[in-house]
Amino acid sequence: MDIVFIKELCIETVIGIYDWERKIKQFVCIDLELGTDISSASNSDVIDDTVDYKAVSKTLKSFIGDSEFQLIEALAEESVKLIFEKFNVNYIKGRFSKPGAVTGSKEVGVIIERYRDSA
């Protein structure tokens, strides 16, 4: 399996459990590893034969930007489900974080791994 990756995709959204968080937008930053077979694309040199990371990024920017999740866990799970629905990937490892959410910490968040069969 090959990996197409996206690193430090940061998207503004409403996220959090506190009243003040429901009134503002905060950044969620994402690192993704998308498992797929890139052999066709490496032979053809055609974007349609691989996972288009720009299309994945655009999909996530729209979905997350318009969402209002309370928990980063829910945002992560639903984002991964959406990627499986729209793109030809068999595996996703996603790191979803909220920079500055905890005083004294650079960022907090979750890392999830899913295979297509368990999505």
For each feature predicted by the language model, list its residue ranges.
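N-terminal, polar/charged subdomain of small-to-medium soluble alpha/beta proteins
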Residues: 1-119
